[in-house]
Amino acid sequence: MNVHYILIDDLNPEHRELSICRCGTVNRVRLGDDCYRTYASLRIDAHDYAALFHYGVIEACNALPFLSESGNSLDSWDEAFLYRTHLQELATILEDAAGNMALQASETILLGWQDQPTAVAYLRSIDPAKTVDFLEKLALFVWESEQGGYDLEFIL
């Protein structure tokens, strides 16, 4: 079988349109509000989205009681909420993950594949330094949210 390998390039608009090229958002919300309101947001780009799963950060975060529509806690293609009472724990998980990742080497990971109509493997280069930078920004966003009495919504 011939397999075509595609290394995802975020600068290529055709690659950004692929369903395997996922992004996300973390929103600062108050679950007790009468109506839904977003107070601030932090975007998760496609590189960091893939890295969060690859390095096990999402899995580590699932030790916390995320509320999700699917019941799968924090997972891809889902929306999940975390109450403010757990934000300090979340920030600690993120800071620990950043510390563990700092010495990792860049690598190319398999995002997914398809068999039909043509066999294609989708790959992505992961730069741990970029991911550490994102985790530090996310941890700061979490700390600021906790200090302001906000809850968090993850749209993955």
Regions found by a protein language model. Give the residues of each.
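Acidic (Asp/Glu-rich) sequence patches and key acidic residues
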Residues: 1-148, 152-156
